[in-house]
Amino acid sequence: MIPNIIHQIWIQGYESIPSELRKYHENCLKINYGFKNEFWDNDRIRNFLKNNFEPEYLELYDKYKIYAQKADFARYAILKIHGGIYLDMDMVCRKNLGDFLGLGFFFTAYKLKNVFTNYLNGVIGSRPNHPVFDYIFKNMFLRQNDASNVTNSTGTKLFRDSITEYTKNNPTNDISLIDSKYLHPCNLYNDKNCPYTCTDCYIAHTNYSSWAPHLKLCKIFFENKYLIFIIIIIIFIILILLWIKYKFNKS
């Protein structure tokens, strides 16, 4: 059983949460009545690691320089000890997550136009002391020298590799991959209103991407893809006309 606790992290502290994300956070508290909310910042995380893990865990946490890596490491540690449901701060909550508390461990998959699939670590539910975390921490320590690569060292690739390794070694397990229509219905290429119009969703990711500016650019591209396509066509036509003019003048 997963405890009815929702964990959220903002390394810089509560007062530093952007106003847009704070609205999402407050809405999630209202939607998920009956849940205990736990907010974690850097100071609380460091004290937690110091009191619940061997010294090398805090050392590795401090070694990470990117906030996203610290948040990744912290969510795994928090869920290992306390259990509960972890949510990224840029999640819009639509339905109470109590329906998932009967599971042992759950997550969902991220898909990009059937070209790219990865396991999303922005929403994770777990009972305390789930053995999959042994694999996750083992791999984070093994990859600590690849700290410049967020996805591989702590993020979605690390998460996927660890779950794949665990399930391969433990065919009988309580790992649940939840259909993305319930936990991640909106991708970068979806309409920006998707988090508010999805019908089956319990939560929806807004793809705020605070740690990855290139993802924000991708989001802007997909939101304006038709306008950008028209601009590209116009530029292409202008280049063709200039080339024709050049050829004509040369002859």
Swiss-Prot record:
It comes from the Viruses. It is found in: Membrane. GO terms for molecular function: mannosyltransferase activity. GO terms for cellular component: membrane. It is a single-pass membrane protein. It is an enzyme of class 2 (transferase). Its EC number is 2.4.-.-. Glycans are attached at N149, N152, N207. The chain crosses the membrane at residues 226-246. Keywords: Glycoprotein, Glycosyltransferase, Membrane, Transferase, Transmembrane, Transmembrane helix. One of its GO terms (biological process) is mannosyl-inositol phosphorylceramide biosynthetic process. Belongs to the glycosyltransferase 32 family. This is Uncharacterized glycosyltransferase L373. It comes from Acanthamoeba polyphaga mimivirus (APMV).
